[in-house]
Design a protein with these regions (language model features):
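Non-catalytic terminal extensions of PLP-dependent enzymes
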Residues: 1-113
C-alpha cells in the first residue's frame, strides 16, 4: 500500500501474493464500503461507528464496558474468516499526519548535567 497523492490509496500487490490473500483483501474493502454506506444512510452513528473507531484493541474488546452503539462482534470480527485469523493491535488509530505536523518530544533531557 502507498499514498502517492494526498487522500488517496494505491494498492499494488506483488506477484508473490496468492490469489486467496487478494480475495480476502477485496472482501475487507467491500465490508468497509458497506459500513460506510450504513453511516451515509443513517443506520450507524456519524461519530461513533465501526469505521471511525476501528481498530479495537484486545483490551477494549474484552473490557466489561463497551461504550459503542455497535456490537463487539461487528467491531472485532467483521467477516467470518477474521475469527480464525484475528490479531489484535496494541493501540487504536494513530493520526500520523497530525503527529508529523505537531511534533511532541517525549525523550528525557539531552543536556549534559
Amino acid at each position: 500500500l502507498s499514498f502517492p497523492v494526498h487522500e488517496t490509496l494505491m494498492v499494488e500487490p506483488t506477484e508473490s501474493e496468492p490469489k486467496a490473500e487478494l480475495d480476502r483483501f477485496m472482501q475487507a474493502l467491500v465490508q468497509i464500503k458497506r459500513e460506510c454506506e450504513e453511516i451515509r444512510d443513517g443506520q450507524a452513528d456519524a461519530e461513533d461507528n465501526v469505521v471511525k473507531m476501528a481498530q479495537h484493541t484486545a483490551g477494549e474488546a474484552c473490557a466489561d464496558v463497551w461504550p459503542h452503539p455497535y456490537g463487539r462482534e461487528k467491531a472485532v470480527f467483521p467477516l467470518r474468516w477474521v475469527r480464525e485469523n484475528k490479531f489484535f493491535p496494541y493501540v487504536t488509530k494513530i493520526d500520523g499526519g497530525y503527529g508529523d505536523r505537531n511534533l511532541c518530544c517525549t525523550c528525557g533531557s539531552l543536556s549534559k548535567e
